UniProtKB/Swiss-Prot annotation:
Biological process according to GO: bud outgrowth involved in lung branching; cell differentiation; lung alveolus development; lung development; muscle cell development; positive regulation of proteasomal protein catabolic process; post-embryonic development; protein O-linked mannosylation
Record family assignment: Belongs to the TMTC family.
Entry-annotated residues carrying Phosphotyrosine: 508
Topological domain ranges for the Extracellular compartment: 36-94, 193-198, 258-325, 380-381, 429-920
Per-repeat ranges for TPR: 451-484, 485-518, 534-567, 568-601, 602-635, 673-706, 707-740, 742-775, 776-809
Keywords, alphabetical: Endoplasmic reticulum, Glycoprotein, Membrane, Phosphoprotein, Repeat, TPR repeat, Transferase, Transmembrane, Transmembrane helix
Name of the protein this chain belongs to: Protein O-mannosyl-transferase TMTC3
InterPro entries: TMTC_DUF1736, TPR-like_helical_dom_sf, TPR_rpt
Signal peptide: none
GO molecular function: dolichyl-phosphate-mannose-protein mannosyltransferase activity
Organism the protein comes from: Mus musculus
UniProt region (Disordered), positions on chain: 829-897
Gene3D superfamilies from the UniProt entry: Tetratricopeptide repeat domain
Gene: Tmtc3
Length: 920
């Protein structure tokens, strides 16, 4: 009997299997994150150490809360946990993820060899394991990182089955430890991927037809006798029944828990994901049945593989006269013949065929649309476990053929060719997964009727900023599938990126017109993929660039919200718009509503902080910045802007934290000069002159024309008695910004006081007055130049005019008195001193300090409103053509105020001026 066969394998066999896997998949280590990997890895915050572990058990495979309708309801927390371990080791470097996938595939192949030993002889089981290890259909499961769900689930799937095979003791007694272990392993397999639960069916078939050796006729005979009262159920059959009941009850419990996890809701898919699922009878049934031979053909002939089989890949079968129905008929005839053979006849061969069929059929049931529609037409990676049964069937058939001496050599040649060609195909197929562009271009070679593939190639080109070429692919997608809302949205977004706003709006309007019309009393969520509602967001984001259409944009946001009150992105985008419309209180309401829907979104807390800045509530703004950083300690804009807010507050106790955040910011953004500049400003506030100099130099090195960094470095030199070092810095500043008033003032002061270059200083001050005749500081300093040139009357007249501009400046009055005293003592005849054009008090002017002050960076990044992209519910975010635009205008707050407080160096400068005027 099969159950009596040894399942042991030796080290040489393990080494051979592992070596073959390594030879086939070594090049997968050089592939990146593509297709579904983007959503599951790059965009999944559950991988980050800052996310609590319990969140893994509350969210789906893609990081979306299971309670949200946009969730795919794919509950695989243990798989996500392995991704998190990868992230802990290498963050987002893809090589470690691909390496672990390859290791898992090798482990599955070795365990599969052990399972094969239960049904096949040593040679045939090795052949089955080798066929499984090299089969090209597995490329998507192994080279695609998200395929780890299949790999992990298969490990525990096979382990559970092997455990169950040990549940039969002497004299047909029940050994409970393996059964308990089986139930545990089934639960673990199911937490890796849902199809893990189907191993229970495999165990039941094994128990009845292999372990107990029953055939279908025997079972019918016993059942008939029992029902007629002519016999009783044998003890062995009762023991079998007990084991089956335990398995069934445990399975039922797992199903109940799984249903509770998804809150009795199925995911929402569009008709583009699985067209047959929304087709009428008999189209739906004919197409679903035809998909079975399609999947079988992929196992038999994996020459044309495609990463995406949705949309128009397989045209619907709408008539019984469709020739493809012959393939369905032939498939069921072959399957039926094998089924009858395996169930009717005793013997090892029939039991091997039966177990192979069960391994092919039962794990495929969740993806078969039998009980519920799925979000794809064909998916190669779901064939990972079913291919085990296929490989057993092929190996068993080869064993039968090779036993005939006439065909023995030919069978070996054919088998060797199959294994070699499959291995080479797998190796070559891995390169297709190197990047998104190579992957989707390879798919288009197989299938040109899938609009999603055209869209995805467009996305890949879009990511490379090749918008012109991307547009061609997006337009082709609309031609292949004219009613694809997402394709039209992609066209609109690309037109926008090409600054062709009129065409962009037309494309968005066309996409909007394809949305289902209002049906009273019917929820939109039940009929529309949530991402399709982003057409309202994208259209509003486009038209709000026109100041006269802000209300129209707001109407679109409100329309989206009315259709889905839980549409978080609509609240976020509307909040941005309301800030632009100078309605911060309403913007605050919008963000608070969004936070009700997602309190763990760091970007939302950041945006709310910006609103509080607009409302002039810096303390509340800082609290919200802090909340954003609690959720995401590396949130770059929150680090930067909260540090600036602390710096502006003037509170000395906040400076260390501000410095810490800026240091974290420059670690995250080492090429951003603003971070170094603001560190320099903090150091200047703390009188750490050498440190300030170092930070300013780093900022200037990264951005040679950084106006504020250049000026403040020059100012720092002037305040630390290094005026001559300041001059070349000022020359550089004025080369880029020849009208920089403060730079001209500082340069003039240094030329006059340090270089004694009176004409040079005079040119600086005169240029200031050419640009701004009312500049008090420039005019006052020009008066000092006149005094230095011994033009006392001119100096007096100049000071009178300056006093008219700033009548309350005591130092100007004092300097005027000094000049007049000098005129009197020198005996110069005094001319009438009427103000030049203005008299004091005739015009109200801004009071301008006479001393140099620090200039706060005008290049320093203003606070920005962040847009939050939550379009993960299409597993392929690249294909998720419905994404809201990423480049909406950023909302800025008022420019950061200049620091007006007088500094010690400025006081020294004033003393120097008075010393000159006193003739000392």
């Amino acid at each position: 009997m099969l159950e009596g066969k040894m399942a042991d394998i030796n080290f040489k066999e393990v080494t051979l299997i592992v070596s073959v896997v390594a030879a086939c998949y070594w090049n997968s280590l050089f592939c990146g994150f593509v297709f579904d990997d983007v959503s599951a890895i790059l965009d999944n915050k559950d991988l980050h150490p800052s996310t609590p572990l319990k969140t893994l058990f509350q969210n789906d495979f893609w990081g979306t809360p299971m309670s949200e309708e946009r969730s795919h309801k794919s509950y695989r927390p243990l798989t996500v946990l392995t991704f998190r371990l990868n992230y802990l080791l290498s963050e987002l470097k893809p090589m470690s993820y691909h390496l672990l996938n390859t290791v898992f595939h090798a482990v599955v192949s070795v365990i599969f060899l052990k399972v094969c030993r239960l049904f096949l002889d040593k040679r045939s089981s090795m052949i089955a394991a080798l066929l499984f290890a090299v089969h090209p259909i597995h490329t998507e499961a192994v080279t695609g990182v998200v395929g780890r769900a299949e790999l992990l689930s298969s490990v525990f799937f096979l382990a559970a089955f092997l455990s169950y095979t040990k549940s039969k003791g002497p004299d047909n007694s029940i050994v409970w430890t393996p059964i308990v272990l089986t139930v545990f392993l089934v639960a673990v397999a199911t937490l890796c991927k849902e199809q893990g639960i189907t191993v229970v069916g495999i165990c039941c078939v094994y128990e009845v037809f292999v372990a107990q050796g029953y055939t279908l006729p025997m079972l019918c005979t016993v059942a008939g006798q029992f029902l007629r009262g002519k016999g009783s159920i044998p003890l062995s059959m009762l023991q079998t029944l007990v084991k089956l009941i335990v398995l069934m009850l445990s399975t039922l419990l797992l199903v109940v828990v799984r249903v509770q996890v998804i809150q009795s809701q199925l995911p929402v898919f569009t008709r583009f994901d699985n067209p047959a699922a929304v087709s009428p009878t008999p189209t739906r049934q004919l197409t679903f049945n035809y998909l079975l031979p399609v999947n079988a053909w992929l196992l038999l002939n994996p020459s044309e593989l495609c990463c995406d089989w949705t949309m128009g890949t397989i045209p619907l079968i709408e008539s019984f006269l469709d020739v493809r129905n012959l393939a369905t008929f032939a498939f069921f005839c072959f399957l039926g013949a094998l089924g009858i053979f395996s169930l009717r006849y005793p013997g090892d061969s029939s039991k091997t065929v039966l177990m192979a069929l069960c391994l092919m059929a039962l794990p495929f049931i969740p993806a078969s649309n039998l009980f519920f529609p799925v979000g794809f037409v064909v998916a190669e990676r779901v064939l990972y476990v079913p291919s085990m049964g296929f490989c057993i069937l092929v190996a068993h058939g080869w064993q039968k053929i090779s036993n005939k001496s006439v065909l023995k050599k030919l069978s070996w040649v054919c088998l060797s060719m199959v294994i070699l060609t499959h291995a080479l195909k797998t190796l070559h197929r891995n390169w297709d997964w190197e990047s998104e562009y190579t992957l989707f271009m390879s798919a288009l070679k197989v299938n040109k009727n899938n609009a999603k593939l055209w869209n995805n190639v467009g996305h890949a080109l879009e990511n490379e900023k090749n918008f012109e070429k991307a547009l061609k692919y997006f337009l082709q997608a609309t031609h292949v599938q004219p009613d694809d809302i997402g394709a039209h949205m992609n066209v609109g977004r690309t037109y926008k990126n090409l600054n062709r706003s009129r065409e962009a709006e037309a494309s968005y309007m066309l996409a909007k017109s394809l949305m289902p019309q209002i049906i009273p009393g019917k929820k939109y969520a039940a009929r529309i993929a949530p991402n399709h509602l982003n057409v309202y967001i994208n259209l509003a984001n486009l038209i709000r660039a026109n100041e006269s259409r802000l209300e129209e944009a707001d109407q679109l946001y409100r329309q989206a919200i009315s259709m889905r009150p839980d549409f978080k992105q609509a609240y976020i985008s509307r909040g941005e718009l309301l800030l632009k419309m100078n309605k911060p209180l309403k913007a605050k309401e919008a963000y608070l509503k969004a936070l009700e829907l997602d309190r763990n979104n760091a970007d939302l807390w950041y945006n709310l902080a910006i609103v509080y800045i607009e409302l002039k509530e810096p303390n509340e703004a800082l609290k919200n910045f802090n909340r954003a950083l609690e959720l995401n300690p590396k949130h770059k804009l929150a680090l930067f802007n909260s540090a600036i807010l602390m710096q502006e507050s003037g509170e000395v106790k906040l400076r260390p934290e501000a410095r810490k955040r800026l240091l974290n910011y420059v670690n995250e953004e080492p090429q951003d000069a603003n971070g170094y500049f603001n560190l320099g400003m903090l150091a200047m506030d703390d009188k750490k002159d050498s440190e300030a100099e170092s930070w300013m130099k780093k900022a200037i090195k990264l951005q040679p024309d950084f106006r504020s960094a250049l000026f403040n470095l020059a100012l720092l030199y002037s305040q630390t008695a290094k005026e001559l070092k300041a001059l070349p810095i000022l020359e550089e500043l004025l080369k880029y910004y020849p009208d920089h008033t403060k730079g001209l003032i500082l340069k003039g002061d240094i030329l006059m006081n340090q270089k004694k270059d009176i004409p040079g200083a005079k040119k600086c001050f005169e240029k200031i007055l050419e640009m701004d005749p009312s500049n008090v500081q420039g005019k006052h300093n020009l008066c000092v130049v006149y005094f230095e040139e011994k033009e006392l009357l001119k100096a007096e007249r100049c000071l009178v005019e300056t006093l008219a501009l700033a009548p309350h400046e005591e130092y100007i009055q004092r300097h005027l008195s000094i000049v007049r005293d000098r005129i009197s003592s020198s005996g110069i005849v005094e001319q009438p001193l009427a103000p030049a054009d203005k008299t004091p008090g005739t015009e109200e002017r801004e009071e301008i300090p006479s001393e140099d002050v620090k200039e706060i960076s005008s290049e320093s990044r203003p606070p920005q409103i962040l847009k939050t992209n939550n379009n993960r519910n299409s597993k392929s975010n690249k294909q998720s053509t419905e994404n809201a635009d990423q480049d909406a205008p950023h909302k800025t707050t008022k420019d950061i105020k200049e620091i007006e407080k007088k500094r010690v160096a400025a006081l020294k400068r004033l003393e120097e001026i008075e010393r000159i005027l006193n003739g000392e």
